């Protein structure tokens, strides 16, 4: 991390506002049969969403494996789906193919909005046309492109600092936010993410529901995404490094790694086998020792 990033990091961790402009997908779903179709596709129950409420959900395939993690918002009797750039097209196609089956309409709004991830919950900018989602990071905003410049000026008026890609990666890992194609992909079974309130176990059937419900009601996940804190300040570890128990048994693999200035330790996101998930469990990565830490690293 360079000197400028470290200054901005300390500013944000002290309560200042930081922002980064990113590419994310935004898709609108409407129609009289929208709830019926959506509840057959995703893990959470959109029927429970009141106006302006939001929830996390996932698109699984028939084997319960992950296609995408999304955030859903109900707005004016329509549903807004927010997704990573890496899964945007996949989510859109999964929704669009059902538009021929009933009163169900899908519109891709991505090119109409700019997206800003805000590292702070106290930002006060009123814009009735913007769309806001909460995250572990702070508050994320979709802003109409014609209003983006004004929004940036408002951020600067509130002394917000711009977050570089490298700094965002540090903050992302500290907050335990998984990234598609890095920390999760189509080999991931949805419950392995360990994201709270991602799945409804009380609603009706949906694609992949049988596998996901069986894991919940009859057993437990084989592994789960969690955190690791290394004893060494600057531990030489990398994504895909194997994790072993202190007895030398395979215990998982690392997915993302960074150095946390606040914790003054190397930290990582990792899939860890069920038997070793308890917080503070000691694990080995080569000659290095790390302890399991429940996410996020920093509250």
Regions found by a protein language model. Give the residues of each.
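Short amphipathic alpha-helix segments
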Residues: 59, 118-127, 236-249
């Amino acid at each position: 991390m360079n000197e400028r990033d470290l200054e901005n990091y300390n500013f944000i961790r002290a309560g200042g506002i930081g922002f980064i402009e990113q590419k994310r997908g935004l898709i609108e779903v409407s129609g009289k049969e929208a709830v019926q179709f959506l509840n057959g596709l995703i893990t959470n129950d959109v029927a429970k969403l009141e106006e302006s409420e939001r929830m996390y959900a996932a698109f699984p395939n028939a084997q319960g494996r992950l296609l995408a993690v999304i955030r859903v918002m109900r707005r004016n009797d329509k549903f807004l789906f927010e997704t990573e750039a890496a899964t945007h097209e996949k989510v859109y196609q999964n929704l669009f193919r059902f538009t021929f089956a009933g009163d169900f309409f899908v519109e891709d709004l991505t090119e109409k909005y700019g997206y800003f991830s805000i590292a702070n919950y106290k930002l006060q900018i009123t814009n009735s046309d913007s769309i806001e989602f909460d995250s572990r990071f702070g508050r994320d905003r979709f802003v109409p492109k014609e209003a983006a410049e004004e929004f940036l000026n408002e951020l600067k008026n509130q002394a917000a600092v711009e977050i570089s890609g490298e700094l965002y990666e540090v903050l992302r890992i500290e907050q335990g936010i998984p990234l598609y194609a890095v920390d999760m992909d189509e080999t991931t079974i949805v419950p392995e993410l360990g994201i709270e309130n991602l799945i409804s176990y009380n609603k009706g059937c949906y694609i992949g529901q049988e596998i996901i419900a069986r894991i919940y009601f009859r057993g437990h996940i084989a592994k789960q995404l969690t955190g690791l804190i290394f004893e060494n300040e600057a531990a030489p570890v990398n994504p895909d490094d194997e994790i072993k128990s202190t007895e030398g048994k395979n215990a998982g693999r690392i997915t993302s790694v960074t150095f946390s200035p606040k914790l003054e330790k190397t930290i990582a996101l990792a899939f860890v086998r069920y038997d070793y998930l308890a917080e503070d469990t000691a694990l080995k990565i080569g000659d290095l020792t790390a302890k399991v830490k429940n996410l996020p690293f920093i509250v």
